[in-house]
Regions:
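Feature captures the catalytic cores and cofactor-binding loops of soluble hydro-lyases/lyases
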Residues: 1-2, 6-111
């Protein structure tokens, strides 16, 4: 079981190109989470996109103590699934209703 504050995006996340692996900040100016830090959060997003090398970004986030406490998405792609497995970050797959009911800033427990 894992608890934390929801940081929710309605856009897919490219971990390789959009996340600072040292700070956990979203660096893509076009992303709806631009400037937010994901460290310690329950990161809620539709799915991951981009290079499979993004899995190593997720691992680096964990190594730098900048990773989310858990990730929750509607569809687990290979990058997110393998990154979470490498970094030992809980990954939850949400139904459309569960995803819609998650609000940015909510305190939630999953698991």
């Amino acid at each position: 079981k894992v608890s934390g504050k929801v940081v929710k995006s309605n856009q897919p996340i490219n971990f390789l190109g959009s996340v600072d692996k040292k700070t956990g900040a979203i660096t893509d100016q076009k992303h709806d989470l631009f400037g937010k830090k994901i460290a310690g959060s329950i990161l809620v997003f539709p799915n991951g996109v981009g290079s499979s090398v993004g899995a190593y970004t997720i691992y680096s986030l964990k190594s730098n103590n900048s990773a989310p406490a858990a990730m929750a998405c509607q569809k687990a792609d290979l990058t997110v699934a393998s990154g979470c497995a490498l970094a030992n970050i809980p990954l939850f797959i949400l139904s459309p209703d569960e995803y819609d009911n998650m609000k940015d800033g909510d305190e939630v427990s999953l698991g």
